[in-house]
Amino acid sequence: ITARLTKGLEAAIPDLEQRVDHILTKQVFGIGITDLTAKLARRSLYCSKWANGPHSIAKSFETEAGNVWFERTEHIWVGGTERVLTADADGHQIKKFTNGKCLYCGAGQKALDRGDALESHAYAFIHTDDITALIADLFGEDMQFDVIIGNPPYQLSDGGGSGTSASPIYQKFVEQAKKLEPRLLTM
C-alpha cells in the first residue's frame, strides 16, 4: 500500500521525503494485537522501533508509537463457576470467580487470566462494543478507511485442555472490520 501511495502521489508531492512523511503520518494507521506486533509494524513502516526516533523515515511524529497503536487490553470474564479467595494489590481479601469465558472472544479464563507479566491476548479491536468509537478515540478523529489489511489470529485457547480445544476468533476481526465500512477488506 505504501509503495503504491508513494508512486501515486509523486505528482502531488514531488519531494520523496515529504511524500513518505505525508503517507506515514496521514494515510497509514495500524493496531498491534500484541506489543511485539506493534513494534514489528513500526520497524516495517518507519524503519525504526520508534516513529519519532532518529532513524525513522517519518519525520513529523511527536510520539514513539506514531500511527501504530498498542495498549494492553484485558478480557472481561463472565460465567465463572468456582469462587476462590485471594488478595488485591493492597492485601485486602477478595472473592474471585474462575473458569469463566471472555465476554468478547470466548477465551477461557483458566488459560488466559494469568496476571500482568504475560500477554493477555485480549485484542482491543475485538474487545469493544463500538469499533468506530474506539478508532476515533485511538487516532483522535472520525476515520474513514478505504483499505483494511489484517492478519488476525484464528483461535485462542479456551482452557479445554491439552491444546485440542480452542475458541475461533478470526471471524470477530472480520465482523469488526466490516463495521468500519472500508472499500477493500483483506484478511
Regions found by a protein language model. Name each.
Residues 1-187:
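SAM-dependent methyltransferase catalytic region
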